[in-house]
Amino acid sequence: MSYYGEWKMFRWELEEELAKPKPDEKKIEELLIEIKNAEWMMQHYE
C-alpha cells in the first residue's frame, strides 16, 4: 500500500472512532501518530 493509501486508511479509522459515543482516547492517539508518520513519509519518499 502506498503512504497515501495508509494515510487515507488511518484518517478513515480516526473519523470512525471520533463518531463513536465513547471514543477510545488511546486508539485516537495511536491513529494520530500513524497519520503524522504517513504524512512525513509522503513528503520524503513519494
Name every feature range the model reports, one short phrase each:
Residues 3, 31-34:
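Amphipathic alpha-helix face/heptad-repeat signature
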